[in-house]
Amino acid sequence: MKQNLKENKEEKMTEAYIIDAARTPRGIGKLGKGSLSEFHPGRLLATVLEEIQKRHDLVTQDIDDGVIGCSSQVGKQGSCVGRMAALDAGWDTSASAVTLDRFCGSGITSVNLAAANIMSGMDDLCVAGGAEMMSYTATLTSERNNRTVDGGNLHLREIHPQPHQGICADLIATLEGFS
């Protein structure tokens, strides 16, 4: 068994390539003001998926997976925004999509997961990225009001306190010697 594992380790994995990048226009999306305020987050993501499809004349039936990161999957960004946006963009219903949450690293984790799936041979073609409309997160979404990262688990909070993100960044920089 050990010999088989060693032999498999020496085999080369399929390479994964990023062939394009697209994003939405920057703008203010705060409720009631700004050029993006009336857009649904899924519709905004769908415009990006439509553009990628158009640029490369993609047959969406050939897309093995859409991997989308979104750290606030509630309200308008809930219900697997990656899958809903793919359907909104006109993707074939056989093309799957998933939404994952790794807080601020959700988008890059999605790209990494898509690449890993290709490199392992599980998928041939993936579309990956992130979707987040900050106006629909904690301050304006009633489902998120008073919600904490630990989901209200007081025992977990006791073991792992939740300082503010900015304080965490300063602490990590100090501990790791970044200036």
Regions found by a protein language model. Give the residues of each.
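Conserved "HGTGT" condensation-loop signature of ketosynthase/thiolase-family condensing enzymes
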Residues: 2-95, 131-179
